[in-house]
Amino acid sequence: FVNYITDDGYIYVRRNGGSDVMIAPSMRVNVHTDKGIVKGVFGYPAIHVRDTAKDEAPNLKTIFIDCGAKNKDELAEMGIHVGCVVTFVDEFMLLNDRFYVGRALDNRIGGYMIAQ
């Protein structure tokens, strides 16, 4: 979920669910708004601007979402506000013509089995 928006248009989130923060940098996301989906990408400070003495792993305080907005007001015009849901862009696929891969596939199959 969108938790905080900076004056210069970067979005910080709260985690909901089992996503690992370590995989977030460079991942594409969908921000779900009342106006529709807004595309974004998780950013992480570049290696040449990080303090290498305390080079820490990505965490919710160091990663952010960039939707290409120049400031907070432009994000608001896109419909983005605190509380908007953010999801990874993902696709269902078949590996080696035998294995199904997809986000939360285990939960979805489990839900289907319970419903049956």
What are these regions (language model features)?
Residues 1-116:
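N-terminal hydrophobic/helix-forming segments and targeting peptides
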